[in-house]
Amino acid sequence: MMLPIFAVLVGIVIGLLFPISLPAEYGKFLAVALLASLDSVFGGLRAGLEEKFDNPIFISGFFVNALLAVLLVFIGDRLGIDLYYVASLAFGLRIFQNLAIIRRYFLKK
């Protein structure tokens, strides 16, 4: 449990020491990829609490979800349709659902 917390802290420190600015055009893509990644993280946390965690499934889901979300936004951008709203809504709902299940787990424990 300490390794993920340590990794997050190291990531925050690296992000503060080496600020990288991205063009505004990538904002939609980055936001949806971040939501997809957070969905995978909270899903992995939920699976760990339910003792169903499988590392290859987590890692592949992490990257595949992010790539598919970015691909969906890219296709929508090319078609002139704001599909990032759909992806944001879907991943946001899944994040809140996973958080609710995690919360219930700790409250019942």
Residue ranges and their predicted role:
Residues 1-27:
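Membrane-helix boundary elements
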Residues 18-26, 44-55:
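Short juxtamembrane and helix-loop transition motifs at transmembrane-helix boundaries
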